[in-house]
């Protein structure tokens, strides 16, 4: 193979469309742009989003102030009143709550909320805590740890 023998693959290149070179050439007269109107004239045509004077879609639709997250983080939620029945110094995790049948489903990482009261000290390990849950666990001489 020599440098002058290199050629593109057959069918990989396409000839450029030559317009305005006579009616018999196939693209003569109006050059494939139709009869009259803005799109047949020289220049850029209309801007993106222009709908011919009709109120465009992006102006018809209201501006949304807030929209929900696409993938919100799902937690398995438990309140402190459910943990009040556990014995003192128990280590509370998602697995231990499922095993003790305090929780029936696993919807994701464990989050402890502060509804209710606890009187026994517990060692709670969870992915998230509400501020009131942290205060109540600490007030009952327990410990909390975010994992």
UniProtKB/Swiss-Prot annotation:
Pfam families registered for this protein in UniProt: Ribosomal_L27A (PF00828)
Gene Ontology biological process terms from the UniProt entry: translation
Family matches, as InterPro entries: Ribosomal_uL15, Ribosomal_uL15/eL18, Ribosomal_uL15/eL18_sf, Ribosomal_uL15_bac-type
Region of interest (Disordered), ranges: 1-55
Keywords linked to the UniProt accession: Ribonucleoprotein, Ribosomal protein, RNA-binding, rRNA-binding
Domain of life from the UniProt record: Bacteria
Compositionally biased intervals (Gly residues): 23-35
GO cellular component: cytosolic large ribosomal subunit
GO function terms (MF aspect): rRNA binding; structural constituent of ribosome
Protein's job: Binds to the 23S rRNA.
Entry-linked PANTHER family: 50S RIBOSOMAL PROTEIN L15, LARGE RIBOSOMAL SUBUNIT PROTEIN UL15M
Record note on quaternary structure: Part of the 50S ribosomal subunit.
Similarity comment text for this entry: Belongs to the universal ribosomal protein uL15 family.
Record protein name field: Large ribosomal subunit protein uL15
Species of origin: Microcystis aeruginosa (strain NIES-843 / IAM M-2473)
Encoding gene, per UniProt annotation: rplO
